[in-house]
């Protein structure tokens, strides 16, 4: 599975490798057939209470969440490949899973997006990939693995159909014209659309590009995804539809974007109160 992710240009192979190391620390010599619901629950508890980072401290909630959810990805893929008959991950209730911390959701304003669009950069494939993601909301791993064969036309509308890396679920999205405008001209069906380097390299170039554009924000593909989600809610798309377009399993994560918009409205009213 690690080799498959590397060949497809997906960013998750390092997390998969780390997850394999974690399993060895948690339950040495465990096999796929040994993983049941109790294993999953105990692994989540271990990540949050016993697993230590290189500094000897308990890892952050967000890191524990990431490692825990990669177990779900591994089990889902193993079930698809026929390595296991049943997926014990599906037996977990919400309270038995590690929850993602809400944290702060930053996004780009239209003015900031315009600045980026008007700022050329030497690595145009990275620039195009990021702006494309701002208008379709794909995660970085899905953008890295994207091929021309994943894009189709139906009734004059372009659609993108992929299996999401994070949860192995298929998603089909209509692409707006702005997203299409950032696709490169080269169209080899089986080649990656953007031909991106490693995510570490991508982040370095994104930050340099942001500096060139005069932005005081740390650019990353979570930011492009949050930007897309915020755009949908601002445009008046209902939470259920927005959650499906973003690729969320339910509306709860999508509600965060609605809270962001509500907070911005409150800030705007506060500014008016100060002026008048």
What are these regions (language model features)?
Residues 150-157, 216, 237-256:
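Short, polar N-cap/turn motifs at the start of nucleic acid-interacting alpha helices
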Residues 33, 84-86, 98-115, 167-177, ...:
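DNA breakage-rejoining catalytic core of tyrosine-based enzymes
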Residues 22-23, 30-35, 53-91, 139-141:
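N-terminal DNA-binding recognition helix of tyrosine site-specific recombinases/integrases
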Residues 98-125, 135-138, 146:
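Long, amphipathic, Lys/Arg-enriched alpha-helical "connector/arm" segment
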Residues 174-216:
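Active-site/catalytic core of tyrosine-dependent DNA strand-transfer enzymes
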Residues 164-168, 246-271:
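Catalytic-site neighborhood detector that most strongly recognizes the C-terminal catalytic loop/helix
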Residues 91-94, 136, 145-182:
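Conserved tyrosine-mediated DNA breakage-rejoining catalytic core shared by Y-recombinases
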Residues 1-20:
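Short, aromatic/basic-rich helix-turn unit that serves as a nucleic-acid recognition element
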């Amino acid at each position: 599975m690690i080799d498959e992710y590397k060949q497809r240009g997906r960013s998750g192979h390092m997390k998969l490798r780390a997850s394999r190391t974690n399993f060895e620390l948690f339950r040495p010599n465990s096999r796929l057939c040994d993983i049941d619901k109790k294993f999953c629950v105990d692994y989540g508890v271990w990540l949050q209470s016993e697993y230590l980072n290189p500094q000897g401290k308990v890892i952050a909630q967000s890191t524990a969440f990431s490692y825990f959810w990669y177990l779900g990805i591994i089990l889902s893929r193993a079930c698809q490949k026929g390595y296991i008959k049943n997926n014990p991950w599906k037996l977990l209730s919400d309270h038995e899973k590690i929850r993602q911390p809400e944290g702060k959701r930053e996004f780009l304003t239209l003015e900031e997006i315009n600045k980026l669009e008007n700022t050329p950069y030497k690595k145009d494939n990275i620039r195009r990939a990021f702006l494309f993601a701002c208008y379709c909301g794909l995660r970085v791993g899905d953008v890295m693995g994207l091929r021309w064969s994943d894009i189709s036309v139906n009734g004059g509308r372009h659609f993108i159909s992929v299996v999401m890396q994070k949860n192995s679920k298929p998603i089909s999205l209509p692409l707006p014209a702005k997203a299409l405008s950032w696709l490169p001209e080269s169209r080899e069906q089986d080649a990656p659309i953007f031909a991106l380097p490693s995510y570490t390299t991508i982040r370095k170039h994104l930050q340099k590009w942001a500096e060139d554009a005069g932005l005081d924000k740390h650019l990353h593909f979570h930011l492009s995804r949050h930007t897309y989600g915020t755009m949908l809610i601002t445009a008046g798309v209902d939470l259920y539809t927005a959650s499906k377009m973003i690729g969320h399993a339910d509306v709860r994560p999508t509600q965060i974007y609605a809270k962001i918009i509500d907070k911005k409205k409150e800030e705007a009213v506060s500014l008016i109160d100060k002026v008048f």
